[in-house]
A protein has these predicted regions:
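Short, well-ordered coil/turn segments that N-cap beta-strands
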Residues: 1-3, 26-28, 53-60, 99-101, ...
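A cross-domain feature marking catalytic cores of carbohydrate-active enzymes
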Residues: 5-9, 32-36, 61-66, 102-107, ...
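Charged helix-capping and loop-helix junction motifs
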Residues: 43-48, 81, 85, 115-120, ...
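Acidic-and-aromatic substrate-binding clefts and catalytic sites of carbohydrate-active enzymes
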Residues: 7-15, 33-45, 71-72, 109-114, ...
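Acidic/histidine-rich catalytic cores of soluble enzymes
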Residues: 30, 62, 120-205
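N-terminal pre-domain/capping segments
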Residues: 1-90, 96, 153, 242-260
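Alpha-helix-loop-beta-strand connector modules within alpha/beta enzyme cores
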Residues: 48-66, 120-129, 208-213
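Active-site acidic/histidine proton-transfer and metal-coordination neighborhood
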Residues: 16, 71-160, 213, 217, ...
Length: 260
């Protein structure tokens, strides 16, 4: 199974060196974004992709560009809602241009007809370009369920975030209820009270055996970790990558166990 990690994993390391460190730690692929506000941190999406190819890292998912406080506008009749739609369309085109597997999307707000129309417009482009839109489980389960209930498209997929599930709605089994829509993962752990994006050894409360049992039913799923190591004290970037890769290998072993 391919194992991936977020290009920015919590340590301020120059992009090309960071990519090499990720590759040297054993990872196969990366998840990243094309958000201009993170250019100072990661470089442009064009420069990132060049670096990934240079060091031999495959592309996994591309995260949408967004500000959390603006997400609700997508469902409202306003200019900001149209802007969010246009930005999402731009991300879909970027994913197609460079070869990302899908675009991961955060949806938040009150479900509405205009929001449905916007999402269907984006999905029409996704169908044309063959780029799936992966809706991530965040802190709005109601909207998540409404979207999948009311919008039908082969390009409407699901990104499972283990940490969000553990904090916001741990009694809801996304992996089983939406197993046919699953296309990508954001794996990380936390204490069950806040979204820490950490590893199990630092603040773990997730039942990884349960997750492995569900993932064993999937084909060709990448084990992508979305972690931010700065929250964990006295660990170098190299050591944190090593620890993350070990956790990924351990999860892979659990998955293989459940496949037997």
């Amino acid at each position: 199974m391919d194992k991936g990690i977020s290009f920015y994993f919590g340590f301020d390391v120059e992009p090309e060196l960071r990519a090499k460190m990720i590759k040297d730690a054993g990872f196969d692929c990366v998840i990243t974004n094309a958000d201009k506000k993170f250019v100072w941190q990661n470089g442009t999406i064009e420069s990132q992709v060049k670096i990934f190819k240079k060091v031999g890292l495959k592309l996994s998912s591309l995260h949408m560009s967004y500000n959390a406080e603006d997400l609700h506008y997508f469902w409202e009749n306003c200019k900001n809602g149209e802007k969010l739609k246009k930005n999402l369309i731009k991300d879909v085109k970027i994913a197609k241009k460079y070869g990302f597997t899908c675009v991961v999307v955060h949806l938040f707000g009150e479900y509405s007809e205009i929001g449905k129309q916007r999402l269907e417009e984006v999905l029409a482009l996704c169908e044309k370009l063959n780029i799936p839109l992966a809706i991530e489980n965040i802190n709005d389960q109601k909207l998540f369920l409404q979207v999948f209930e009311n919008i039908k498209s082969d390009m409407l997929k699901f990104c499972y975030d283990s940490g969000h599930n553990n904090v916001f709605d741990r009694n809801f089994n996304y992996l089983e209820n939406f197993k046919d829509k699953l296309i990508t993962l954001h794996l990380h752990d936390n204490n069950g009270n806040c979204d820490e994006h950490t590893l199990t050894k630092y603040s773990g409360s997730i039942d990884w055996n349960k997750i492995a049992k569900s993932l064993a039913k999937q084909n060709n799923i990448k084990l992508d970790y979305e972690v931010f190591g700065k929250n964990d004290e006295n660990v170098s970037a190299e050591e944190y990558l090593k620890q993350t890769f070990i956790q990924a290998k351990n999860l892979e072993k659990l998955i293989e166990k459940h496949k037997k």
